[in-house]
Regions:
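Positive-inside N-terminal membrane-insertion signal
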Residues: 1-26, 170-177
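N-terminal membrane-sensor/transducer module of prokaryotic signaling receptors
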Residues: 1-11, 51, 55, 144, ...
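Amphipathic alpha-helical segments and their boundaries
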Residues: 14-67, 105-108
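Long amphipathic alpha-helices with heptad-repeat character
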Residues: 40-43, 53, 57, 61, ...
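Secondary-structure edge/capping motif, primarily at the C-terminal ends of alpha-helices
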Residues: 47-50, 63-78, 93-100, 119-133, ...
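Short, solvent-exposed, charged loop/turn and helix-capping segments
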Residues: 86-115
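Extracytoplasmic
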Residues: 111-114, 118-174
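Selective recognition of signaling/oligomerization transmembrane alpha-helices
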Residues: 162-198
Length: 198
């Protein structure tokens, strides 16, 4: 024998439909909030990297080159080697690398780090080299070129990070419009269903 179960009333079905649509809208809103928080986190990391990279000494090349020139010509101004400047640039590069997502930015900052290591070795090599001519040749063929490349790679890093920041902003805007569209469609469906049932 089959039991006759009572059919849910129209009012009960409408309430279930209303709750399910409300739940759908809430899920979309929570997803939108999660996406906003994720993008905000990524955006703040990239912004922090750009700010830190801009702390790189704008006069790095000139400072290191000048100190090395004074050292090579045995001037009283050349008593201190620019190893601290090189180490600071390398440390900054390593800090930036740890928080960088963009492939081109990572490539640029890795190159700068490697060149800082090479520059440090070349500075030490000059200290171990005898003779003004030999030291001057090392200065011109190594130090000047390496400092120029390091500075260029830091600027390249900044360029790519700014581009990555722009792409994050564009992706966030596109996702927000998509989420808003989904919420609008969900609300429209809810209104249509409720109007048909009334």
């Amino acid at each position: 024998m089959k039991r006759n179960e009572p059919h849910p009333s129209l009012d009960g079905r409408l309430r279930r439909l209303l709750w399910s649509m409300l739940l759908l809208v809430c899920v979309i809103l929570v997803a939108t909030l999660a996406i906003l928080l994720l993008h905000n986190h990524q955006y703040s990391i990239v912004t922090a990297n750009i700010v830190r990279a801009s702390q790189f000494n704008q006069n790095f090349k000139e400072d290191v080159d000048l100190k090395m020139y004074y050292y090579v010509i045995d001037s009283s101004y050349g008593e201190t080697l620019p190893l601290q400047e090189v180490d600071e640039a390398k440390t900054l590069g390593q800090e930036l690398l740890s928080g960088t997502q963009d492939r081109q930015s990572r490539k640029a900052i890795t190159s700068a780090i490697n060149l800082c290591e090479n520059l440090r070795e070349r500075i030490v090599q000059i200290t171990e080299t005898d003779g003004y001519e030999a030291r001057m040749e090392l200065l011109e063929s190594n130090i000047y070129i390496l400092t120029e490349l390091i500075q260029q790679y830091f600027y390249t890093y900044l360029y790519h990070e700014a581009g990555y920041l722009d792409s994050l902003q564009a992706a966030l805007t596109a996702r927000l419009w998509l989420e808003l569209g989904l919420v609008a469609v969900g609300a429209l469906i809810l209104v249509i269903v409720l109007m048909r049932r009334s």
